[in-house]
């Protein structure tokens, strides 16, 4: 079997215009490289999920996970976003950081394994950047139905902040979206005593609403803060008071706060008002024990290869790692520096990709 270098793999992956949920042929290319792995295809509603798996012995099952889909490139690039450009030690293309660099490193690392006391798998989806409804979670549901869930997982999201090796994600905040609608009575602005102005009602308590911290955070999570993202009401005229006003907000919550806490807070704050509240939990927070084998072994490999002692954090947005946690699989995340995610002229350091490959290899060898 021919050996594929991680940079060669990355260069080819970046050419695929795999905008969610279209893989654009990327999975066929990966299948060609991992042709001695068992291949399991789990496709649903236009989303492709593929598991490449190989059993070497009776021991633990470690899964490397990621996504091959990317967001649209937009305009303003200095080069073709799907024709990778190597310049001054960087590769420029859409998906370079998020996250084809990690996928390439994972493919290279697992393809070269000769001996391992257990099972190694690679779980890839074409729907992480979109709704992610039929992506990684569907693949894990399938594995659960067969009693084949992995014991540990590494997700290759770009986790590093300023120096390669500085950050391992051991958890993520949850995300709860809400819409609060204050109801009033519409009327003529000249007769405020005959109206019930919902804007005034909202404003009277708004200082206690916007920016509210539901908890004080802990060693791994920042406080769960209510962030207002939009306010709408009225008819865009100056002589009619509105019948209602709506506030859209989001709470990135720690494991100390849930939807009931948010509901109870708003119910109490606006208890004397006529209002409607809609909350939607889009993801739950999770935290992997820092003493878990996957966290400790990954940390050792990162420090060994990069020379940097990583910190364990939970910051940033949501990721597919939450689905592994949902299925009680210990999971940690590690990848390249994340300074150009979804940006024009997205790029990744060649040196980082090479080191990332070595880290994944070292993790397998010493697990």
From Swiss-Prot:
Disulfide bonds: none
Binding site for Zn(2+) 1: 67, 98, 157
Active-site residue list: 69, 128
Keywords: Amino-acid biosynthesis, Cobalt, Diaminopimelate biosynthesis, Hydrolase, Lysine biosynthesis, Metal-binding, Zinc
Swiss-Prot/TrEMBL cofactor(s): Zn(2+); Co(2+)
Domain of life: Bacteria
Pathway: Amino-acid biosynthesis; L-lysine biosynthesis via DAP pathway; LL-2,6-diaminopimelate from (S)-tetrahydrodipicolinate (succinylase route): step 3/3
GO biological process: diaminopimelate biosynthetic process; L-arginine biosynthetic process; lysine biosynthetic process via diaminopimelate
Enzyme category, top tier: hydrolase
Reaction catalysed by this enzyme: N-succinyl-(2S,6S)-2,6-diaminopimelate + H2O = (2S,6S)-2,6-diaminopimelate + succinate
The protein's Enzyme Commission number: 3.5.1.18
Reported function: Catalyzes the hydrolysis of N-succinyl-L,L-diaminopimelic acid (SDAP), forming succinate and LL-2,6-diaminopimelate (DAP), an intermediate involved in the bacterial biosynthesis of lysine and meso-diaminopimelic acid, an essential component of bacterial cell walls.
Subunit details: Homodimer.
Matches recorded under PANTHER family: ACETYLORNITHINE DEACETYLASE, N-ACETYL-L-CITRULLINE DEACETYLASE
NCBIfam families: dapE_proteo (TIGR01246), PRK13009.1 (NF009557)
Name of protein: Succinyl-diaminopimelate desuccinylase
Gene that encodes it: dapE
């Amino acid at each position: 079997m021919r050996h594929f270098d991680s940079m060669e793999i990355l260069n080819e992956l970046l050419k695929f215009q795999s905008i969610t949920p279209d893989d654009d042929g990327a999975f066929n290319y990966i299948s060609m490289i991992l042709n001695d792995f068992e291949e399991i295809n789990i496709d649903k509603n236009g989303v492709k999920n593929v598991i490449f798996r190989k059993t070497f012995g009776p021991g633990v099952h470690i899964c490397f996970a990621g996504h091959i889909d990317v967001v649209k490139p937009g305009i303003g690039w200095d080069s073709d976003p799907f024709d990778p450009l190597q310049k001054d030690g960087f590769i420029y293309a859409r998906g370079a950081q998020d996250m084809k660099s990690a996928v390439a490193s994972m493919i290279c690392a697992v393809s070269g394994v000769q001996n391992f006391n257990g099972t190694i798998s690679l779980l890839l989806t074409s729907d992480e950047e979109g709704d992610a409804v039929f992506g990684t979670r569907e693949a894990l549901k399938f594995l659960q139905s067969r009693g084949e869930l992995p014991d540990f997982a590494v997700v290759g999201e770009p986790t590093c902040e300023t120096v390669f090796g500085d950050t391992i994600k051991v958890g993520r905040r949850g995300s709860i979206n809400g819409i609060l609608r204050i109801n009033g009575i519409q009327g003529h602005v000249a007769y405020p005593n005959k109206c019930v102005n919902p804007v005034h009602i909202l404003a009277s308590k708004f200082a206690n609403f916007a920016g509210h911290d539901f908890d004080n955070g802990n060693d791994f999570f920042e406080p769960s803060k209510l962030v207002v993202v939009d306010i709408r009401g009225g008819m865009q005229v100056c002589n009619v008071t509105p019948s209602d006003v709506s506030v859209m907000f989001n709470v990135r919550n720690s494991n100390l706060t849930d939807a009931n806490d948010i509901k109870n807070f708003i119910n109490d704050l606006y208890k004397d008002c006529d209002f409607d509240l809609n909350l939607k939990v889009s993801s739950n927070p999770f935290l992997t024990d820092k003493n878990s084998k996957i966290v400790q072994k990954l940390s050792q490999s990162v420090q060994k290869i990069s020379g940097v002692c990583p910190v364990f954090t939970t910051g940033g947005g949501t990721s597919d790692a939450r689905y592994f946690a949902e299925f009680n699989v210990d999971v940690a995340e590690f990848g390249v520096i994340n300074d150009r995610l979804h940006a024009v002229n997205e790029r990744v350091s060649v040196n980082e990709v090479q080191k990332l490959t070595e880290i994944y290899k070292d993790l397998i060898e010493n697990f």
